[in-house]
Amino acid sequence: MVWTRFKSLANFLEKFQTMILTIVRKVLLPILPFFVGSNFALITYKGQLGQMQTFIWVVLLIVLCQFVWMFIMYVIASIYSRRNGWLVAKYYPKAYFTALGTMSSAATLPFALECIAESPIVKKDTADFALPLFSNLHLCGSVIAEMSLVSAVYYMMFGCLPNMYSMLLFAVLACVIAIGSPGVPGGLNMSCITILGSIILVDQAPEAMVEFFGIMTAIYTIQDGFGTACNVTTDGALALMTDKYLAKKNLA
């Protein structure tokens, strides 16, 4: 009886997930380019286009931070596993550029599995287990981009940075929300709208919140491919650490 109910619940959740992803792909994603374009049109109309040049440097800084983080992750993985992390990372350019183009961890997963299968130091069974798991749980590149853009947009609009307590609380909650955010373009940013309004913009007028969300979504969507690529590439480092851990526990 219990097993039958469990299977019924699992089937319901799978159908619900399929329904939500269908809505995202069929409704939200097609209108996203129009939303981004309308926000840039509004920025141009208000004469704020000159300020947008600042975000070019912000995006470049975000990409640099993501590459630094990828390097750190593979160094940590090499130290923990006592194997050369380069023997995983060097096979990942294909997955990186696929993620850069698709802006979707889910769409890039088959290519990531192909890439890590070429590595001689990660077992196939471990990779098949670890990569699908981490593609949903581990969104470090997206969180780096989200935190950086929140600070940059806030400074552009209000002339100061959010207080440290609010940013730390937002960072913790963003990491938690990242676990459940959909693996679609702009998924983390859209998932963080609620905590943006309740933590970072709690003292701002509703009109300012709407404008903030619009600018955030426009800029985030443009650079989202780099965050997704960072997510996918660092999953290889986590897979290497997972392989070592399972070997130590005699589980693989």
Describe the role of every protein-language-model region.
Residues 30-34, 62, 66-75, 79, ...:
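Transmembrane alpha-helical segments of multi-pass membrane transport proteins and ion-pumping complexes
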Residues 1-88, 251-252:
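Signature of multi-pass transmembrane helix bundles
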Residues 20, 56-73, 91-99, 167-181, ...:
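Small-residue-enriched core segments of transmembrane alpha-helices in multipass membrane transport
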Residues 2-7, 15, 46, 81-86, ...:
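Juxtamembrane helix-boundary/capping and inter-helix hinge elements in multi-pass membrane proteins
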Residues 9-27, 52-59, 88-92, 96, ...:
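Hydrophobic alpha-helical segments of integral membrane proteins
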Residues 49-56, 81, 85-93, 160-169, ...:
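Membrane-water interface of transmembrane alpha-helices in multipass transporters/channels
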Residues 100-178, 249-252:
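Helix-loop-helix junctions within the multi-pass membrane cores of secondary transporters/permeases
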Residues 148-252:
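Transmembrane alpha-helical segments and their short flanking loops
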